[in-house]
Amino acid sequence: VGLPRSGSTLIEQILASHSAVEGTMELPEIISMTRGLRRQASPGPNATYYDVLATLDADAVRALGEQYIERTRIQRKTPAPYFIDKMPNNFVHVGLIHLALPNARIIDARRHPLACCFSCYKQHFARGQNFTYSLEDVGHYYADYVALMAHFDEVLPGRVHRVIYERMVEDTEAEVRRLLDYCGLPFEEGCMRFFENDRPVRTASSEQVRQPIFRDALDHW
């Protein structure tokens, strides 16, 4: 989870270079799940899916997780036991993910606010991400994202693993080892050679992840 242009594609490419992990890119199932819950809410402009989620018992919440696993099965192409859902905007739904998928590993990809916001602003996204069309809007959005993730850090301590892009660039192996340890995976040298992985990548960073990590993007703002 995180904002666009924050290093999430790099993280996915590193993890997808592990023998136990399949990269399945950005999946729509969590957002579809929230829309389904929202349709069950009482009519009104202020109704949210959170209102419905709060009324569900343990069995109903477990069923949501099972539904997610079943619906994402079509995206699986390899027998790897783990897969990645790289939808950045799922940071809004960390609470739902925590409840419905208690065994999921939640990774927050974070980048320096000026670097992230400027990169978002100058990137023409294929669709969505309307908040990136104004520097003021993207700045407010970044601040809201940081505040929400701080809330989850407080109420769910240790549940979310944060990968700071700048630290990944400065000390790649140490950060990769921390990431794999959080995921319960042994270190594999292939994760350090992620740029040799020829899996399809369909984000704005598709060219960068075909190269070794470089420092050029650290302070370009």
Which stretches of residues belong to each language-model region?
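PAPS/PAP-binding and catalytic site of the sulfotransferase fold
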Residues: 7-22, 93-102, 109-112, 162-189, ...
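Generic structural signal for helix capping and beta-alpha/helix-loop junctions
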Residues: 31-33, 116, 197
